[in-house]
């Protein structure tokens, strides 16, 4: 990345678009603390976290999903979300919860499942789910952390048309108290969900604006749409 500046305000819906290799995921990883930038700074919720690890940023209220599934096929949907709340350490549950706290964590897990419309699968094993349902569970796990900001890395990748519509409805309906930032190749979803769009190319931000401005921008057409991009 080169001279990238991303300023997102509380409650905003922001999409980051660009072809493969544009630097989108690298930018995500720097923000989340999974990668340390060679220069520059990262500020979250008014605090400089440039040298802080990912777990510290998560405690501040940052949650994310990944392009590749990180779910365990042998767990149920409910247990997957539940464990994302109580945490694990050394392969075991981190300290045993008191009954009241355990019930509260279970209810948070179920509420997160309801939010992403996967509650009918709470007892199903993750290994039995479709690709789209995997995405729903991953988002539920992130939401169960009750984040201030949610970052989604290509959530529509590999989804069917119907699953993309379900995802779009889910993201549009998210609590406005949660700041949403998503990387997407699906321009239709990004422009329907986001209020502002950041377009990247070769590690640089080339355009930033509203969905209407992005649709009308000649640079976007020349460097992105004109390079074989096709909405399906």
What is each model feature region?
Residues 1-232:
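Glycine-rich phosphate-binding loops of nucleotide-dependent enzymes
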């Amino acid at each position: 990345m080169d001279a990238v500046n991303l300023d997102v305000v509380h409650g905003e819906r922001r999409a980051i678009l660009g072809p493969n290799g544009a630097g989108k995921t690298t930018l995500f990883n720097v923000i989340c603390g999974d990668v340390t930038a060679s220069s520059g700074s990262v500020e979250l919720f008014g605090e400089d976290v440039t040298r802080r690890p990912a777990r510290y940023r998560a405690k501040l209220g940052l949650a994310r999903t990944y392009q590749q599934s990180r779910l365990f096929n042998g767990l149920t949907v409910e247990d997957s979300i539940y464990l994302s709340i109580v945490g694990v350490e050394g392969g075991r549950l981190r300290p045993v919860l008191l009954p009241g706290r355990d019930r509260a964590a279970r209810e948070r897990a179920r509420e997160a499942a309801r939010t992403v419309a996967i509650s009918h699968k709470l007892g199903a094993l993750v290994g039995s789910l479709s690709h789209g349902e995997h995405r729903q569970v991953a988002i539920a796990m992130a939401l169960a952390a009750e984040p201030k900001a949610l970052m989604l890395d290509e959530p529509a990748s590999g989804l069917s048309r119907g699953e993309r519509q379900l995802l779009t409805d889910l993201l549009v309906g998210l609590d406005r108290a949660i700041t949403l930032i998503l990387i997407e190749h699906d321009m239709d979803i990004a422009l329907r969900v986001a209020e502002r769009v950041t377009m990247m190319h070769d590690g640089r931000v080339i355009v930033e604006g509203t969905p209407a401005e992005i649709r009308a921008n000649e640079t976007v057409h020349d460097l992105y749409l004109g390079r074989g991009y096709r909405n399906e």
